[in-house]
A protein has these predicted regions:
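Single conserved hydrophobic/aromatic residue that forms the stacking wall/gate
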Residues: 1-8, 12-13
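Short alpha-helical transmembrane segments in multi-pass integral membrane proteins
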Residues: 1, 48-115, 157-204
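Alpha-helical transmembrane segments of multi-pass membrane transporters/permeases
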Residues: 71, 126-152, 167-170
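Core transmembrane alpha-helical segments of multi-pass membrane transporters/permeases
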Residues: 9, 43, 203-204
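Small-residue-rich hydrophobic transmembrane alpha-helices
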Residues: 20-80, 117-136
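Interfacial/gating helices of multi-pass transporter permease domains
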Residues: 10-31, 97-102, 162-163
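Interfacial helix-capping/hinge residues at the ends of transmembrane alpha-helices
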Residues: 10, 45-46, 86-87, 124, ...
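Hydrophobic transmembrane alpha-helices of multi-pass small-molecule transporters
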Residues: 32-35, 147-152, 177-181
């Protein structure tokens, strides 16, 4: 994510100072989101790792299912809420008037694809909880590379400016989420996702 921001900032420098300021002004909001989602995934991972270590396969499966369902509903809430309150958040942060429009554009696109960030963090949290830290790292590197390539394509080649920077980030995050969910769907472990059986287990 840091790499993505750096690349995006570099692309904005090529465009205008206003675009660079817009990316910088939304940094605290995005960092807070990432920290919040990482906290949720860590909490879920602690529970899953305890059940996994105790060989309680049924509880592992139920916890993973609950985590995915919770992520789905939270992603809807954050997407809708984020898009609508973006202008208010920027005003509360005293964002300069000359960059508030571009900052709002970036944030609205980012919130539109925030599900990718959430599912990647939750999925990677599950994988790390069962001892697989390799796949999340690979997918994170892959996401950073894709983000860099798309930044160059959208901003430099297509001249999409701030929209291109935001769209590149969203696409890269969604791809990493898809890869993470694919691993969880195809594994033979008790943490495998069975899409037809997903449900919330309120007893956990």
């Amino acid at each position: 994510e840091i790499c993505a921001c750096l690349v995006g900032s570099e692309m904005c420098i090529r465009d205008s100072k206003e675009a660079l300021a817009a990316v910088g002004s939304v940094g605290p909001i995005i960092n807070s989101l990432i920290g919040f989602f990482m906290g949720l995934s860590t909490g879920a991972g602690v529970i899953i790792s305890q059940y996994y270590g105790a060989k309680a396969d049924e509880k592992v499966s139920r916890t993973v299912s609950t985590t995915l369902v919770m992520t789905f509903f939270l992603s809807i809430v954050f997407t809708i809420l984020g898009i609508f309150i973006t202008p208010y958040m920027l005003r509360m942060m005293s964002t300069p008037n000359d960059v508030i429009r571009e900052s709002a554009t970036y944030l609205k696109i980012y919130f539109g694809g925030v599900a990718g960030l959430m599912f990647y963090n939750m999925g990677s949290g599950v994988l790390r909880a069962v001892g697989d830290s390799r796949h999340p790292l690979y997918f994170l590197i892959f996401s950073a590379v894709v983000n860099t390539v798309l930044d160059l394509l959208f901003v430099v080649s297509f001249g999409m400016e701030i929209e291109g920077v935001a769209l590149a980030t969203v696409i890269a995050q969604c791809l990493s989420a898809v890869l993470t969910l694919y691993v969880l769907t195809t594994t033979d472990g008790p943490y495998r996702i069975c899409w037809k059986k997903l449900c919330m287990d309120w007893s956990l």
